[in-house]
């Protein structure tokens, strides 16, 4: 067993606080039990994502991810060793959390170890499904739903959120040698990989960002169109995330998108909380 001294739930809270993520703004209206389940789920995502981000030796990275695959098996055999999985254990059966989604998340992180380019959107969409849609579907189970179409909503929302991350982090990822935008789409705009990696500022970069933003907006709208009125109340935290990221997309387009490789557009904590409150009272950005 890992020699952790911190209480498992406190460990998960600390892990999520370190990330400074927008997800925390979405949790503020949740009851304690659901909030703790979401925090444990997100802490798991942080653990495996940190391996993909920080491990420079792919072999070591794969070994660490394999440890997590084994740990998920131990979790479902009621013998978890890590504080994150110990914190998750009470919620597995309570919220009917499917083991395969956790394995898919790990598989997505392994893609980050193996690939730093994606040939086309089909490849990228698989990556987005594994690292984001799976999390959305698990979250939807925790929030609760009555209509199975809500899982389609969660799937598409995950794609939309991850595409937004990719647009926002285009310059940051380029500095790490990563290009998530499909290469065939760069080629159509006559943008070379080296131009992305060198952080050029150009109108064709603006065109690229506009095109990628339109695709993300499509998936947000596809998600919302699949969310049953029966489930809007329970799925409010996901809607908060959707609105925060949708507003972020709009800000990216307003903030000189041709310069996205040299600047990272962010929303203030106050703005995120404002969006969360407005969403709670049923204000809609995505129509």
Predicted stretch roles:
Residues 1-162, 167, 171-287:
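Catalytic cores of Mg2+-dependent Asp-rich isoprenoid enzymes
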